[in-house]
């Protein structure tokens, strides 16, 4: 346990930041799941509305990821990895491979 006041305050600040980061990451994951679900819906029933839903959900997820990187919740490489993962899934869904 911390002995001086500054160490006690650092413990409080670390706990506060942990909770804030946790909620931010949870919101980011939720937006990513929505994008994946939109891709699944488009795969089952392709339409222009479904395509717009994919684009909107991807833009929302990208925005949240970028803000998480900017505020220090995520490392920039982790953010880039998540965005790459989303992009590849969306690209495979919208533009199927033609042989």
From Swiss-Prot:
Annotated Pfam families: Ribosomal_S20p
InterPro entries (UniProt xref): Ribosomal_bS20, Ribosomal_bS20_sf
Cellular component, GO annotation: cytosol; small ribosomal subunit
Function: Binds directly to 16S ribosomal RNA.
Keywords, ordered alphabetically: Ribonucleoprotein, Ribosomal protein, RNA-binding, rRNA-binding
UniProt lineage: Bacteria, Bacillati, Cyanobacteriota, Cyanophyceae, Synechococcales
A single BP term in Gene Ontology: translation
One term of GO molecular function: structural constituent of ribosome
Entry protein name: Small ribosomal subunit protein bS20
